Amino acid sequence: MKYTSTKTLLDIEFEHLNKRVAGVKTGFTSGYIAIDKSLGGSGFEPGLITVFAGRPGMGSSLISLNVLVNQLMQLNDSEVLIYITTKDSSTVILQRILAIAHDIEITKIQNGDLNVHELNSMQDGSFCNKKLHGLVLVEHPSPSIEDMQNLLFNLVKEGKSIRSLTIDTLQNVKTDSSITKDQGVAQMLKELRVAAIQFQFSIIVTSEVSRRVEYRDGPKIPQLKDLKDSRLIADKVDFVYFVLRPMYYEVPGEDETISDEMHLICKKNKYGPLDLIDLTVDLKTQRITNGLTFTKI
């Protein structure tokens, strides 16, 4: 059995601590102050797995796409982000990305209802001509762990530095048919973590939430047990955030709801406190911006 001496561990920890004190970030920022703070201060750390979960229409895919756009803006030439979409076409995802990045209504892009300035700003801007080149967008209805591992190894072989991997949605991943679905998902997450540690990238996954939340008496706030195939998922990840929009869910203490509000409720934080994060969403442009409050719960 291999072990690491306490002195070595202390040396590593103080090296990281000195970087944090000096303001050197070890993680990859989400673009949202409150989310980064909840994740430990530096954003998404390599080797860690974060889940954004919610019922259909709540915005789990939307928050993952907004984080993706924010991170694309920060990439160096050799760095890439991987986004695997299992439910939407790559065309739909790209349209949503363009709407977020350029703050243009999604229906204008979908219907071609753009003025000359809007069209030129997209075609000639640095986002489409440079930053978007760092996106590896994969459309697959049921990718397997082997598919993802092959993609990772091929990108590294090409000299790319992978900063993050996003899977939307976790439940659509193909798992070993000889075991239960939740066991298969847990095994897949375990193997992805190994690759994430080896190649130093973070993992973001979106997850479905059981319909039983809709029929629950009282506040309809999901719990870890409401994650689909949840028996082992919650044990295998580091952070779980449930995405809620008060106009759909009853939130305790809120008599009036604002239609552009979005809440991230942290139900698992392996390394810190649970938080409630308020964000603001514009569904026309698909853009999510920082809210006003950050509350420890």
Q: Where is each model-derived feature located?
A:
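The Walker A/P-loop phosphate-binding site
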Residues: K2-I104, G125-F127
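Flexible beta-alpha connector loops of hexameric P-loop NTPases
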Residues: T107-L114, V136-H140, K174-A186, Y215-K225
